[in-house]
UniProtKB/Swiss-Prot annotation:
Species of the source: Homo sapiens (Human)
Pfam families per the UniProt record, alphabetical: VPS51_Exo84_N
Claim: Acetylation is one of the keywords in the record: yes
Keywords assigned: Acetylation, Congenital disorder of glycosylation, Golgi apparatus, Membrane, Phosphoprotein, Protein transport, Transport
Topology in the lipid bilayer: Peripheral membrane protein
Name this protein carries in UniProt: Conserved oligomeric Golgi complex subunit 1
Superkingdom as given in the UniProt entry: Eukaryota
Gene Ontology cellular component list: Golgi apparatus; Golgi membrane; Golgi transport complex; trans-Golgi network membrane
């Protein structure tokens, strides 16, 4: 409906012009407008009814009241006029009547007494109004003086209710009965207002002194009782302040108000109750004895005329003031007991007891208040506000003098009352924060493991999950995040501390799932660390040891005196959090290890992928969580440069073990725990891999039928040798020796290398690789021992071990021994010690070969082994060991066959299977050799294009043409810096 959308102004315009209304609207629209207008009229009527019913009734009542007041006022005016006229007639009649002169003298004393009594009654009637005015102006002492004057008037006029005598004044003036009853309530009211004023925080010293004087005059108490009343009132104020409703940000104001109240109480206690010893001159900055001077002013007799201050200023202009008796004009309140000054010893003991009594309330109250502070930044804000408040107090020299006079020692608000409470709350917040991080990390770990176990390598649901199954897919996949956006113009040295590129993650074989977990953990640690750093000094220069004596003296307290305790607290909770995560990982690994032990297809089990994830996670936590390092080492000690310098000094032997910083030792301990757990995870994986591969290797080795032996045989080299015949002539003969290991040996090594590279072997811990190779070698020797035992027991149909097969077995065993033996221990010991088991198997195999032939074959066999190891150093890169790969070439290098060997780079590289030329002199020959091989290999290109096929990368490298003019990518400094 168009009418409903029109504005009210348009509606009113249409209604004013009926002709235009009927021209622009139809019948239905006009009916709608009519209904709308009628509804608006009803709404206005309802509003008018409400206004009349609620507001107009009040107006009528107010008008009636005003009219009644007007009539009363007119009546009062008429009565006053009539009284005035009547008095005037009386005066005229009195002046007209003659008086005998004798009666004038005796009537003067009685007339003066009458005027005096009338003036007293007049004053008595006006005192209540004066008392209320004084109470409204918070002048309790003046109200007390008026009240005591009122009591004095009662006694003079014999108005006391306790008096048994007949009171002629009350009988003639009944209004005084009500006045006496009203005056009886003034005492409790003045006492209540005075005690409430004592509880107020922002009251001047003079006002507190007057309030105490009022209490002492009304209760007839001593100065010691006044001190007790003052301290109890302030204790009640402290309790009220601590029990106020809590509103988060108001807690800082509450605590600061509490500290300010304590300081103000001590100042006012000194100003009111402390008296200087004889001989000491008063200090204008430190007033004292104010209570006693005020009492002397109110009750003392000197100087003369002081007491007239109660009435003189207010009543001296009245005509009846001159008729008041002297006892009223010069009235001064009195104390029943003398106000003796309080001794310093009593004042000190009383204040110390009061502070001790308030200390428990303050601790409980502050503890409850701090429960509402949910961040360490909030705690730091409260502490800093207290520091600023107390520093402003302590800058005044009088504060120290005041504390020495009252307590004989400084009052340490922060150290004695607040610091431990803040530390306890800080510890609670830290523990709660890291417990939350631990629980959330455990939930994230369980979720990641469930996702890994529920997904399979064939499901395309999550590409990142596939990288956990096969790290090579992640390593050789391209991503926009591989290089930082500023990699071309920002060097590594100028890059941020926490900046890392995708290539850096790939170089360390850190999968996206591990990156996400570490990023989530590090972000939580960063939030907690940033929150805690607000409580600590911003830099080392703010630490207590660097604060100048002048600054320390002017400060109320050292804000960062507990920085070491807070950092130790943070360190302890951080280590506990990481150990909790490690314990969760250890429990998961143990359960998976028990489940994987009995499985035959363990390599395809999703449980094993979870093991690899947890092993990589433990290996990467220390590097990908830089804020964990900051939590343990501190902000200043966690930088990379000092750590590098420390390691350099350790290598040079300039730093002794005893000189290691405890925080560094704690960080090393955490790294050792993570590395140990990572090694345990990799050990579960390596045990499963070795078990499966050795099982296949042993089955192939023990096959003794002729077909199996021929199927596993490889080509042999044919060599010509010259021998001296019995006649002395040289005889040339040909011998055949194995040049390659058996197919099952090559398959075993290639499968082992493939499994290692599948999990990112270049980033595996060295000890894991060594233990894995050692385990493989032990199992291989066990397989050969089993073969020897079976051959010693002759079976029907079994293929005998010929000399050629014995040569091949011996060649395989020696090759496996060279490849699988870790070189690190041999280099350290200087010379490798032969394994007795290997020697025993070798002797058994050599016994199957003719001794004369063995002597002839051995040198050539060793030469073939040496060439084979060098040729396969790239294909079996990580299996052969980095110590052997990266060693410099010996002088016995055969210059006739440089193209048969493809050495690795002379420095440690990130990817173990990446082939590089070693020298420029061999580059051309190596390139020609690759080109020659590339012409033979093209039929295999169909499989090289599939990155999932094992060994496809190596086939791709040897099948593509190499550009000899292009330098190696890893020799370009700017590109190598991008990968860091």
């Amino acid at each position: 409906m168009a009418t409903a959308a029109t504005s009210p102004a348009l509606k009113r315009l249409d209604l004013r012009d009926p002709a235009a209304l009927f021209e622009t609207h139809g019948a239905e629209e006009i009916r709608g407008l009519e209904r709308q207008v009628r509804a608006e009229i009803e709404h206005k009527k309802e509003e008018l009814r409400q206004m009349v019913g609620e507001r107009y009734r009040d107006l009528i009542e107010a008008a009636d009241t005003i009219g009644q007041m007007r009539r009363c006022a007119v009546g009062l005016v008429d009565a006053v006029k009539a009284t005035d006229q009547y008095c005037a007639r009386l005066r005229q009649a009195g002046s007209a009547a003659p008086r005998p002169p004798r009666a004038q003298q005796p009537q003067q004393p009685s007339q003066e007494k009458f005027y005096s009594m009338a003036a007293q009654i007049k004053l008595l009637l006006e005192i209540p109004e004066k008392i209320w005015s004084s109470m409204e102006a918070s002048q309790c002492l003046h109200a007390t003086q008026l009240y005591l004057l009122c009591c004095h008037l009662h006694s003079l006029l014999q108005l006391d209710s306790s008096s048994s005598r007949y009171s002629p004044v009350l009988s003639r003036f009944p209004i005084l009965i009500r006045q006496v009853a009203a005056a009886s309530h003034f005492r409790s009211t003045i006492l209540h207002e005075s005690k409430m004023l004592l509880k107020c925080q922002g009251v001047s010293d003079q006002a507190v002194a007057e309030a105490l004087c009022s209490i002492m005059l009304l209760e007839e108490s001593s100065p010691r009782q006044a001190l007790t009343d003052f301290l109890l009132a302030r204790k009640a104020t402290i309790q009220k302040l601590l029990n106020q409703p809590h509103h988060g940000a108001g807690i800082k104001a509450q605590i600061c108000s509490l500290v300010e109240l304590l300081a103000t109480t001590l100042k006012q206690a000194h100003a009111l109750f402390y008296t200087l010893p004889e001989g000491l001159l008063p200090d204008p900055a430190l007033p004292c004895g104010l209570l006693f001077s005020t009492l002397e002013t109110i009750t003392g007799q000197h100087p003369a005329g002081k007491g007239t201050g109660v009435l003189q200023e207010e009543m001296k202009l009245c005509s009846w003031f001159k008729h008041l008796p002297a006892s009223i004009v010069e009235f001064q309140p009195t104390l029943r007991t003398l106000a003796h000054p309080i001794s310093q010893e009593y004042l000190k003991d009383t204040l110390q007891k009061w502070i001790h009594m308030c200390n428990e309330d303050i601790k409980n109250g502050i503890t409850n208040l701090l429960m509402y502070v949910k961040s360490m930044k909030g705690l730091a804000g409260i502490r800093d506000a207290m520091w600023e408040l107390l520093t402003n107090e302590s800058t005044n020299h009088s504060w120290d003098v005041l504390c020495r006079r009252l307590l004989e020692k400084p009052l340490l608000f922060w150290e004695d009352m607040m610091q431990q409470l803040f530390l306890d709350r800080l510890q609670t917040l830290t523990k709660e924060g890291f417990d939350s991080i631990s629980s959330s990390s455990k939930e994230l770990l369980v979720s990641a493991l469930q996702e890994l176990e529920s997904s399979t390598s064939n499901s395309p649901s999550n590409k990142h999950i596939h990288f956990e199954y096969n790290m090579s897919l992640f390593l050789w996949s391209e991503s926009p995040n591989d290089l930082p956006s500023d990699a071309a113009w920002v060097s590594v040295a100028n890059r941020g501390q926490f900046a890392s590129s995708g290539l850096s993650m790939k170089a360390q074989a850190i999968s996206p799932c591990v990156q996400n977990f570490c990023s989530a953990l590090d972000s939580k640690l960063k939030v907690k660390l940033d929150d805690l750093l607000a409580y600590l000094p911003s830099d080392d220069s703010s630490l207590p040891k660097d604060v100048s004596p002048t600054q320390a003296k002017s400060s109320a307290f050292d804000r960062y005196a507990d920085a070491g305790t807070v950092q130790e607290m943070l360190r302890t909770q951080s280590v506990a959090c990481i150990k909790h995560i490690v314990d969760c990982i250890r429990a998961e690994l143990q359960s998976i290890e028990e489940g994987v032990q009995g499985q035959q297809d363990a390599l395809n089990s999703a449980k094993l992928h979870s093991v690899l994830f947890m092993a990589r996670l433990c290996q990467s936590l220390g590097e990908l969580c830089p804020h964990l390092k900051q939590c343990i080492l501190g902000k200043s000690e966690s930088s990379e440069k000092p750590a590098r310098e420390f390691r350099a000094l350790r290598k040079q032997g300039k730093v002794k073990t005893q000189e290691i910083i405890p925080t560094q030792a704690k960080w090393q301990e955490v790294k050792e725990v993570l590395l140990q757990q990572s090694v345990m995870g990799y050990q579960v994986w390596s045990s499963a891999v070795v078990k499966v591969l050795i099982h296949g290797f042993t089955q192939s080795l023990l096959l003794d039928d002729a077909g199996s032996v021929l199927a596993t045989a490889t080509s042999w080299d044919e060599l010509e040798i010259q021998e001296e015949a019995e006649s002395g002539s040289s005889v040339t003969s040909k011998i055949r020796l194995p040049a390659q290991p058996s197919w099952y040996v090559q398959s075993f090594l290639f499968s082992l290398c493939q499994e290692i590279n599948r999990v990112g072997g270049h980033a595996l811990p060295k000890v894991t690789l060594q233990e894995m190779l050692k385990s493989c070698m032990v199992q291989v020797v066990a397989a050969y021992e089993k073969l020897s035992e079976e051959k010693q027991i002759k079976k029907e149909g079994a293929f005998p071990v010929t000399q050629n097969r014995a040569l091949q077995l011996l060649y395989d065993l020696r090759y496996l021994n060279i490849v699988l033996t870790a070189k690190g221990d041999e280099v350290k010991s200087g010379r490798s010690k032969p394994d007795s088991r290997i020697e025993k198997v070798t002797d058994h195999l050599e016994a199957l070969i003719d001794p004369f032939d063995l002597d002839v074959f051995t040198p050539h066999l060793n030469s073939n082994l040496h060439r084979l190891v060098q040729r396969t150093s790239v294909l079996f890169g990580l299996v052969t060991g980095t110590e052997n790969q990266l060693a410099p070439r010996s002088s016995t290098f055969n210059s006739q066959e440089p193209h048969n060997i493809l050495p690795l780079a002379s420095s440690q590289i990130r990817f173990g299977l990446l082939p590089l030329s070693m020298t420029s002199t061999r580059k051309a020959k190596s390139t020609r050799n690759i080109e020659t091989k590339a012409q033979v290999v093209p039929p295999a290109r169909s499989t090289a294009g599939d990155p999932t096929v094992p060994g496809s990368l190596f086939r791709q490298l040897v099948s593509e043409e190499d550009n000899t003019s292009a330098p190696s990518l890893f020799k370009l400094g700017w590109l190598s810096s991008m990968t860091k």
